Each structure stands twice: as C-alpha cells, then as structure tokens.
C-alpha cells in the first residue's frame, strides 16, 4: 500500500497532492459523517442531521411558482424556440441581459442605495470560482491576504490551494462580539511585515460567515482607509447580502465608496465577490460574480472566467427571472421574513436549555456558544465535544477551530437548509443531550437553566463513555463530500 501511495505521488503534480485543499479538516469531516448516515424522517430517523450546510431552502417554492407562471423563461418548456441560439458558443463576457439583470439584482439586495455597472459584472463558477479568480488577478504565490477570524473554512481551498497565497488571520475576540478593531488589523499587518511576508490585500466577509453579523459604516471606513493607506487591495465577499432578517441593515462597500468623505479613496483597490447561492438559494446553478472598480482587474478576470463560465441556459433563465421586479421584490421581502422566523424559532429552542448564540442579524446560521460544555478550555476538549455531537447526538455542526477561531467552544450551526420538522427534531436531540426534556417539565425557564448548569455545565463522559474506536469522522473511509459553503 505504501508503494502505491508513493507511486501515485510520483506521477501527480505537487499541486494535485498537496494538503492545502483543507479536505481533512473537521469542517469537511462532519460532511463525511453525514454522508455515511444521512437523516431521513422515514427511511433513517436516527441518522445524522445536516447542520453544517449553509444553504437557503426556505424560499425555493417561490421560484418554483415563478417557473410555473413563466414557462418561456426555460428552454425546456415554452422557451424552446431559443434553444439553438443558446446551445451555440457564447462570448465569455456573458449574455448582456444576464449581466444587466445581475447588476439590477445587486442594487436591490443593497436597498437601491447604490448602482452597479453591468459592464463590470464578470461571471465565475460560483463564489468559489469568483474568489479564486480574484486572487489570481491580484497576487502571486507566496503573497498574503489578511482575513478577520473566525472565517469560512473553505477559504483555504478557494483562496490558497491553487493560487499559492497565504492567509493571515486578524484575530477577533468574543469580548467585543468578534468585532474587527483597528488594533487587530494593524497587528496582523505588522507581524506579516516582520516575517517578510508581502501582504497584497485584506478580505472581508460581510455579512460574516460564520458570525451572521453585518459590518457597520465606521468599521468599513476604517478598513478601507487602512487598505488605501498601505496601498493594498480590499476584497469584499458579500454573498450573504440579502440574508439580513433584522436590524441593522446591510451596508455594502460600494455604498461607502459613494460617500462624499471617501472620494479620496483609490477605487482601483476595491473588489466585490457576489453569488446567487445564498441570497436566492441556488448553489447548484454555480453563479459567481466578480465586480471590480478596476478596469484592468475586470479585463483580467474576464479572460480567466473562460475556465468557469455560467452555462448559457442558466444565464437565460436567471435573466428572465431577475428582470421580473415584482417577483424579486416579493422574494427578498419573503425571504427575510422566513429567515427571521426560523432564526427566532431555533435560537429560542436553544435558550430553553441555556445555550446562547452570538447576537446576529443575518446569514443562514448561528454562532453557538458551547463553552460551558467543555471539560476544559482547550481545542482538544472542543474536538471531543464535537465528536460526541456528531456520533452520539447525531448532528453535524462545525467546530470553531475549523474557522480559525482562537477561543475553544464556539460552533457554527445552520438552520435554513431543512424543513420545520427536521429543525424540531434537531432541537429535541439537543434537549436530550443537555438533560432537559421539555415534555413533562413544568419548571420555569430560569429553573431549567439552573438545573442544566448544575448537571451539565461540565460535560461528563461517565454516562456516555466515548470509545475512540467508534468511527470518527476524522478517520472515516467515506469518500469526500461535495465541498460547498
């Protein structure tokens, strides 16, 4: 077997065999555990519930209804007359009507407070492709980007794996709700300089994944001023722009650039990554967008986009749907309402058993605080707790360490990729796990919390002796899952 591995490595490239992909991180290992034992209400009611998938399935019925009412929007139905034109080779600039519809949709998701030029819209194969393409445009192997942590685990794949760049965390702390501070940004930059690492830019995810929080104007202005002062790029990943379900509203970096006091900024250093995967719930369509204020970057990204184009059929369909302003307005309004309702239901269910989450107003997930359940404040203890949740409680949640969080005990848990019934089953499992059954318990909420703290504040393994020989996701032979956000 060793000979086979050595032989394989010798005939493949270093890029193909390096470990920068991040596939073996706990974030993706949770996916493997789910794949090996997926929950189904009838076929496998005791299976693992997928709560590691940041997917928005709450409004797909609205899209289905639109398709039924607009059969000409698809070449598979009444739009068949357009089949030949769509099947032919297309310029990688993209269909003009598609780019126009995307620009208009980006404006609507930002409250109509900013305008986007369709000529600056560049296509890519999902946000994954868009993020990698923008890095290829801006940096060389060995260069680095600063990224506030905790941050999306698959950035290692999207931004590092094939580009050869480094990611340097800007450490944020729970003491101020993980807000980005000027001090932390400066410290990360200066440490890189001392190590002779060339910093080419800073990457913001706004709204944040995994925090589900939005950045205020002051923070955006501060970061923008810093990047301009040091002549480095600012890449804003805004793929969760329309997932805001509570105040404060989302503020795009494009809005900051439009403000009078920021006219001195060099717009050539600012770039936006967008997608329809989260806001519309269409990750399978693989629609990623690069929007740059730099002409050279637009031209370069457009040439590179030939490696990851959006299919013409997809462009045709989306151009029709997103051009329906009445539909878009209703969709965005209904999506925000449903996300808010689901978030409230889920977080209230956690609060009943004393589990708190970081206060958030956006996203498809919560940043869940399980620090009281750790035996000790270490990442080893976090991983032990995570294994119990995966193998015993049968929930795939993502440990904070995979998001480069510096404090053990935080977990990202997704709530928008399932129906109401599955959410309730997940909450019931959590209640059983912490020893507080809602049914038959007539004590007050405060008494429940006190009892929970008394009995379960420090996770005891005496009743659930964890046998390391039990299948661990880390050693699972299950093939890798599709690596999605």
UniProtKB/Swiss-Prot annotation:
EC number annotated for this UniProt entry: 4.4.1.14
Cofactor: pyridoxal 5'-phosphate
Recorded catalytic activity of this chain's protein: S-adenosyl-L-methionine = 1-aminocyclopropane-1-carboxylate + S-methyl-5'-thioadenosine + H(+)
Post-translational modification as stated in the protein's UniProt record: Phosphorylated on Ser 460; phosphorylation may regulate its turnover.
Modified sites of kind N6-(pyridoxal phosphate)lysine: 278
An annotated GO BP: fruit ripening
InterPro entries: Aminotransferase_I/II_large (IPR004839), Ethylene_sulfur-biosynth (IPR050478), NHTrfase_class1_PyrdxlP-BS (IPR004838), PyrdxlP-dep_Trfase (IPR015424), PyrdxlP-dep_Trfase_major (IPR015421), PyrdxlP-dep_Trfase_small (IPR015422)
Sequence positions that bind substrate: 55, 92
Pfam family of the protein (one): Aminotran_1_2
Recorded metabolic or biological pathway in which this protein acts: Alkene biosynthesis; ethylene biosynthesis via S-adenosyl-L-methionine; ethylene from S-adenosyl-L-methionine: step 1/2
Gene Ontology molecular function: 1-aminocyclopropane-1-carboxylate synthase activity; pyridoxal phosphate binding; transaminase activity
Entry annotated with the keyword S-adenosyl-L-methionine: yes
Family: Belongs to the class-I pyridoxal-phosphate-dependent aminotransferase family.
The protein's role, per its UniProt record: 1-aminocyclopropane-1-carboxylate synthase (ACS) enzymes catalyze the conversion of S-adenosyl-L-methionine (SAM) into 1-aminocyclopropane-1-carboxylate (ACC), a direct precursor of ethylene.
Subunit structure: Homodimer and heterodimer. In vivo, the relevance of heterodimerization with other ACS enzymes is however unsure.
Note: The stability of ACS proteins, and the regulation of such stability, play a central role in ethylene biosynthesis.
Name under which the protein is recorded: 1-aminocyclopropane-1-carboxylate synthase 2
